[in-house]
Structures are given as structure tokens and as C-alpha cells.
């Protein structure tokens, strides 16, 4: 399927032409049919001789409904431009072409209607000249009459040629469906419709609306139920548990987590045909912006149109043809999106705005706007991988994809430790060499400083290591530690071979070890430990070093003691009581109970009932 929007002056026969092509009335409202005037978007479809199905979005031509017109034109990949033979090129023809040009649409057909009322030649010649100076360039043209049917077969042939040359959408792309209608169906609930430009929607999918998950209950396209719909297509999506008041034209249904929302974008202005005509001398070359007074054009309150949404926008000039746009609400945009700036007061399209950056740097210092403008010279709307990573120091691959970095560029970096451009790959992150070296140096210094400050605990915890380097992700600690020649063990980063220095407590620790070697189950009391200089910090360090095992109730044993206990318990009649275990181990309840609970936790013993345990497996002394 392909989707084509109409464009042209009011009452030039757009709806009549769509009706003649499809046999369907595109005007949905009784008032539209009564007045013979399209007010809102209309929809119809047909099957061409080639078998290709084409959906039409019929847009209103009247100046008062230009917002509705832009909502229909924005998501469409091609346009059917209509001019009446008996009226020729008119004001709304010019404004609609300005919108087409601002959006950069390159695929279209010119249809001169009402050829049964007047010679179509003059209107055809003028319209061709106007379109040739726009992004459409030289397009196929035909004179038709929706009343007599003259030229309709040729138009259908031209439509077939047009759709066969439209770009093939990426059906694996993330979904962004700009909503142009929402309504309810009894027994089904809320339905939204829109033009799906790329990607695939399936029944049962979880998508996202204003940051909240929504579930796809059912799908229709061109009046038929589908289990999945692939772009490009007109699609109706039945959403579960979404009130009709919670979704409206201008909302976007998107792939969860795949579309960052933004209130601020840096853009390049693309002149509309109206702005060029307003300022241009007759010898202006197409695309020449030198004479356009953007300060005049951008004065006052402007509206930004993108997809099906229209929002007021604050414009801040950056360079000769670049501006920063700030919106009152966050939108799911990416670099490369084409938008329209319109002056509602003067009722005309001012410019197109090509999105260059959806995550631009703050402009805090004096002169920062001019510096930013110079940085954007040559930016194309396809984000450069190295530029985006360099500006941030480090960036997740998923975030770069969401910013609009081409998938093939990101795929080429997959599996590499270093990209050809010198970026470092660590898991899902790409890092500049400078930032990577900074992390390595900071982590090394932090580990050394911690060792000096805490000789009992030479290891830096993962979170402390992350904070020391200002890492954006704790999972980067391991890769940075390896690069620094450090050791990551049991969740701590150390110098290789580093061990706690117990200082004066070393003698006390050896005394403890000596006592427990002679009497493994005779755990010393807290006063004994204190006399040896072994407080909580020293014992915690000794446990991390593998020299002691700490159990509940301040019971301190050797790490081998549980295995020694199992030798004794295995020899008991099974099951056994706590008292029997205590007597066999020749120890106290203070030691026996936490020791048995420890054996339970390791799966070596298990409770049979409230008073009995049994051995499950006898470990070796090295267990």
C-alpha cells in the first residue's frame, strides 16, 4: 500500500477527484457534503491496475482549515496536487505548495481538474512552473474531469508509475504513528487512525502513548481486519483501556523506549515558496537564502507543525539559516524530521525546519548561540556518530539510534572494541578515547586513595568506583578496571594481589586463628575479641580476606568450620535435635544455633520439623 495526500486551492475539485478515483465519498461530515466544502481530513482508497492499493488523504483547501491540511499532508510520502482549469493558480495553491516544499516532498502528480469547463493549457503551464521551483521539481501532469471522466485512465496510470517509484519503507523500524483521528466504537472502545510511515504494528503489541503503555486490541487497514500492518499504510488501531478523551489528533503512538521526547530542537530553515516569493528578486536562484530576512520572517508567535501536531514555538536564531525551537510540550522527534513553521497571524507558511539535533547543548554563556550556529554549519539532519558521541563523551547505542544515527552506522560498530573512528565500545556504550582515558585515570587514583585511607579495606565497591569516575552505568566498571590493570573480585576493585593491612590487629587475628584451630567450635566472646583488638571493621576485613567466617550473634569461626561440623553431624542418628548437635560439637547454644542455620542456608542440612534436622549432603573440607 501507499498513501497519497491531496493539495490545492479550496473548491478546485480535490474531493471530486478522489471520489472519481475511488468510488468513495471522502467528506465524512454532513456539513461538508451540505456546503460542498472539505473542512477536515477525508479518507478513501482504491486498487490500481497494477494491483497496488493506494489510500488517499483528502485535505481541506480553505485557508481557515490550513491546520487540518498540514495534519494530513505531514505524514504522507507523496502528493496529488490539484489546480482547476477554470481558475488557475490561486492563493491557497501557493500556500499548499509552500507546505509541500517546506516538508521536502519529492514525489507527486499534478492534476488540472475541470478540463471540461475551460482550456486546461494555461493552468497546466503555470502550475508546472510553480511546482518545478519547489521540492517536487518536474512532475507528471494530466488534465482531467471528475464529472466526465476525461483523463481519469491516464491519471490512474500516472498513479501506478508514482507508487512504483516511492521509497520502500523499513518495516523493522521503530513505530511512530501520528494520530489524525480518535473515536469510539461500541463494544470495542477507543480507535485511533493515522498514516504509518514505517515499522510494523501487530495485534497484542504494547506501544506507548504520552509515556504510558497501551495495548493493541485490533487492527484495520482499508476497512479490513489485520493481525499486523506494515508501513506505508493507513491504519486504525483499537487500543485497550484507553479513554477516547485521553488521545487526540497530534498525539503519537510509538515503540516503547525507542523515541526520546524533547522540548528543544536545533533546526535548519528550509525556505518555503511563499517566503522566497515574498523576498526574492526575479533573478533569484532556487535555494538561495541570502536575501531572505529571517529576522522579519521569524518575528511574532509561530506555530510548529510536525506529523499531525501543531504547537506554538519560541524561535531563537543561531546562525544564518539555523534556529533553536522550544516547545511547551515534549514531542517524539528525531534528527532528519521535517517540520513546518507557520505564521498564523499573517496566515502563511514561513519556512520548513529540518531537525538537526533533538538533544542540543544548553546555551548558557554569552555568545553561545553564535558558537552553536557555527557548529551546525554543514549538519545534514543525519546525525554523525562521532560528533554525537564526542559531544557527550559517552553514549548508549540505543540512545544514538533514538537520536537518528543510521542503524547501519551503529551496526558497523557492533562487536568492535574500537571503531574505525577511534571510539571505544564497551557493552552497549560508545566512548571517546579522551573520556575513556579519563575514566581509567580516575579509577586508578580512586583505588589507590582508598587503599591508603582504608588499609583494612583496600577494595573499592562498584558503586564507589562508578561515582569516582562519574560513570553513566555501573556495568562499565569492569571494562574500565581491566583497562586500568585493576582486579575486580567479589564486587570490589583492587590492585592485583592487594590484601588488607591489619596493622596492630594482625597479632590479635593470629591469636583468634590459633584458638579456633585448637577448638573449632569454641567461638570467643565479644570481650575476648575486643582484647585482641578485633572490632567490627577488623573482622569485616578479615572475612573479606577469607580468614574468618562471621555468623549471627557475633559468632566468629574459621571458614573451614562448617565442613568440620558436617563430619560430626553426619555421624549422628538422623534426624537429630539441636541439643544433640550441640553436644556432639561440644559447643554452646550461642554457637550451635547460628552454625546450624548457616548449614541450612548452604543446603547441607534441612529442618524436618520444629525440633529436628537431617543431613542432606556431606561436603569436603574444601567446600
PLM-predicted stretches and their roles:
Residues 1-59:
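Conserved G1/Walker A P-loop phosphate-binding module
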Residues 4-8, 12-20, 64-70, 88-91, ...:
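P-loop/Walker A NTP-binding module and the surrounding RecA-like catalytic core of P-loop NTPases
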Residues 6, 117-123, 129, 140, ...:
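C-terminal effector modules of nucleic-acid-centric enzymes and ribosome-associated factors
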Residues 11, 17, 36, 58, ...:
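Residue-level signature of catalytic and energy-coupling elements of molecular machines
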Residues 52-53, 59-64, 73-97, 101-123:
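Conserved Switch II/interswitch segment of TRAFAC-class P-loop GTPases
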Residues 62-63, 86-90, 105, 114-119, ...:
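Conserved nucleotide-binding/hydrolysis micro-motifs of P-loop NTPases
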Residues 115, 129-275, 279, 285, ...:
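Conserved catalytic-core segments of large NTP-driven translation/proteostasis enzymes
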Amino acid at each position: 500500500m501507499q498513501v497519497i495526500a491531496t493539495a490545492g486551492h479550496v473548491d478546485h475539485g480535490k474531493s471530486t477527484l478522489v471520489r472519481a478515483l475511488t468510488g468513495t465519498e471522502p467528506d465524512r461530515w454532513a456539513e461538508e457534503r451540505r456546503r460542498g466544502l472539505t473542512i477536515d481530513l477525508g479518507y478513501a482508497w482504491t486498487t490500481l491496475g497494477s494491483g497496488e492499493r493506494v489510500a488517499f488523504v483528502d485535505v481541506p483547501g480553505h485557508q481557515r482549515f490550513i491546520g487540518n491540511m498540514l495534519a494530513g499532508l505531514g505524514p504522507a510520502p507523496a502528493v496529488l496536487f490539484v489546480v482547476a482549469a477554470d481558475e488557475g493558480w490561486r492563493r491557497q495553491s501557493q500556500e499548499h505548495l509552500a507546505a509541500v516544499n517546506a516538508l521536502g516532498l519529492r514525489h507527486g502528480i499534478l492534476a488540472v481538474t475541470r478540463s471540461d469547463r475551460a482550456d486546461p493549457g494555461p493552468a497546466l503551464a503555470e502550475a508546472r512552473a510553480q511546482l518545478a521551483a519547489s521540492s517536487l521539481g518536474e512532475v507528471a501532469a494530466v488534465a482531467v474531469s471528475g464529472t466526465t471522466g476525461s483523463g481519469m485512465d491516464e491519471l490512474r496510470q500516472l498513479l501506478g508509475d508514482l507508487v512504483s517509484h516511492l521509497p520502500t519503507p523499513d518495516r523493522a523500524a521503530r513505530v511512530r504513528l501520528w494520530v489524525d483521528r480518535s473515536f469510539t466504537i461500541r463494544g470495542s472502545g477507543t480507535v485511533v487512525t493515522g498514516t504509518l510511515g514505517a515499522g510494523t504494528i501487530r495485534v497484542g503489541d504494547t506501544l506507548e502513548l504520552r509515556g504510558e503503555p497501551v495495548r493493541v486490541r485490533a487492527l484495520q487497514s482499508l476497512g479490513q481486519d489485520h493481525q499486523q500492518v506494515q508501513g506505508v499504510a493507513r491504519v486504525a488501531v483499537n487500543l485497550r483501556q484507553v479513554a477516547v478523551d485521553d488521545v487526540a489528533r497530534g498525539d503519537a503512538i510509538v515503540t516503547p523506549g525507542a523515541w526520546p521526547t524533547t522540548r528543544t530542537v536545533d533546526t535548519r530553515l528550509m525556505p518555503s515558496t511563499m517566503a522566497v516569493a515574498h523576498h526574492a528578486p526575479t533573478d533569484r536562484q532556487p535555494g538561495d537564502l541570502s536575501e531572505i530576512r529571517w529576522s522579519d520572517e521569524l518575528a511574532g508567535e509561530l506555530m510548529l507543525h510536525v506529523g499531525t501536531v501543531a504547537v506554538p514555538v519560541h524561535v531563537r536564531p543561531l546562525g544564518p539559516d539555523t534556529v533553536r525551537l522550544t516547545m511547551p510540550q515534549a514531542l517524539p522527534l528525531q534528527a532528519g524530521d521535517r517540520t513546518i513553521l507557520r505564521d498564523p497571524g499573517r496566515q502563511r507558511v514561513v519556512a520548513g525546519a529540518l531537525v538537526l539535533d533533538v538533544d542540543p547543548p544548553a546555551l548558557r554563556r554569552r555568545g553561545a548561540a553564535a558558537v552553536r550556529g557555527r557548529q551546525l554549519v554543514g549538519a545534514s539532519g543525519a546525525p554523525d556518530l562521532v560528533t554525537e558521541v564526542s559531544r557527550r563523551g559517552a553514549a548508549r547505542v540505543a540512545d544514538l539510534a533514538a537520536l537518528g544515527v543510521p542503524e547501519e552506522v551503529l551496526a558497523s560498530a557492533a562487536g568492535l572494541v574500537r571503531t574505525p573512528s577511534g571510539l571505544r565500545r564497551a557493552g552497549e556504550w560508545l566512548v571517546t578515547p579522551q573520556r575513556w582515558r579519563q575514566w581509567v585515570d580516575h579509577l586508578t587514583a580512586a583505588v589507590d586513595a582508598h587503599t591508603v585511607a582504608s588499609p583494612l579495606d583496600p577494595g573499592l565497591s562498584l558503586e564507589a568506583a562508578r561515582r569516582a569516575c562519574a560513570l553513566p552505568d555501573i556495568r562499565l566498571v569492569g571494562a574500565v578496571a581491566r583497562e586500568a590493570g585493576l582486579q575486580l573480585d567479589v564486587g570490589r576493585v583492587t590492585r592485583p594481589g592487594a590484601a588488607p593491612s591489619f596493622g596492630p590487629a594482625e597479632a590479635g587475628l593470629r591469636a583468634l586463628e590459633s584458638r579456633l584451630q585448637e577448638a573449632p567450635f569454641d567461638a570467643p566472646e565479644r570481650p575476648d575479641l575486643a582484647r585482641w583488638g578485633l572490632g567490627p571493621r577488623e573482622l569485616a576485613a578479615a572475612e573479606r580476606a577469607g580468614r574468618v567466617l562471621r555468623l549471627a550473634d557475633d559468632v566468629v569461626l574459621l571458614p573451614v568450620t562448617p565442613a568440620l561440623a558436617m563430619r560430626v553431624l553426619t555421624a549422628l542418628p538422623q534426624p537429630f535435635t539441636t541439643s544433640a548437635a550441640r553436644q556432639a560439637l561440644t559447643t554452646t547454644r550461642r554457637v550451635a544455633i547460628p552454625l546450624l542455620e548457616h548449614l541450612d542456608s548452604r543446603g547441607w542440612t534441612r529442618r524436618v520439623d520444629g525440633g529436628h534436622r537431617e543431613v542432606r549432603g556431606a561436603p569436603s573440607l574444601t567446600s
